[in-house]
Amino acid sequence: MQVVLGSLFLLLLSTSHGWQIRDRIGDNELEERIIYPGTLWCGHGNKSSGPNELGRFKHTDACCRTHDMCPDVMSAGESKHGLTNTASHTRLSCDCDDKFYDCLKNSADTISSYFVGKMYFNLIDTKCYKLEHPVTGCGERTEGRCLHYTVDKSKPKVYQWFDLRKY
């Protein structure tokens, strides 16, 4: 049943742009349709009644809750650290996205974590930002994403956008 729900969730997301569904539906309905089944924190917003409440897939949900509470985020259209988020969705520091990736990979809820990871890291075309020496190129690229950046260590670090790892 979880595999079927996960597949339906991915199908729904494949017709969306960022976290927003293109169909005309109400805000409450949107939030309910975009939260991964069996979780309260995995998706657009959350459905929890408080920070300690988790859904049926507690390990996956805990990863999503921690990710949602990242202290360094940039909302759509916001400028911060000398960067502007031109995406239609919130972007996070690479540190938070890396921790989210590792948490999902190590989760005891293997199937739900797999689908949430695939959705966030593979389907949603997003980037993260971090303080790093200026990027001079990409040493290795796959599926349109840079896997290994080359940097100029002779110059001071600046905030820049980076591709997320594939899940």
Swiss-Prot record:
Keywords: Allergen, Calcium, Disulfide bond, Glycoprotein, Hydrolase, Lipid degradation, Lipid metabolism, Metal-binding, Secreted, Signal. N-glycosylated; contains mannose, N-acetylglucosamine and fucose alphal-6 and/or alphal-3 linked to the innermost N-acetylglucosamine. One of its GO terms (cellular component) is extracellular region. Residues 19-33 form a propeptide. Glycans are attached at N46. The keyword Disulfide bond applies. InterPro entries: PLipase_A2_dom, PLipase_A2_dom_sf, PLipase_A2_His_AS. Its cofactor is Ca(2+). GO terms for biological process: arachidonate secretion; lipid catabolic process; phospholipid metabolic process. Its EC number is 3.1.1.4. Disulfide bonds join C42-C64, C63-C103, C70-C96, C94-C128, C138-C146. In vivo, intraplantar injection in mice cause spontaneous pain behaviors and paw swelling. PLA2 catalyzes the calcium-dependent hydrolysis of the 2-acyl groups in 3-sn-phosphoglycerides. PANTHER family: RH14732P (PTHR12253). This is Phospholipase A2. It comes from Apis mellifera (Honeybee).
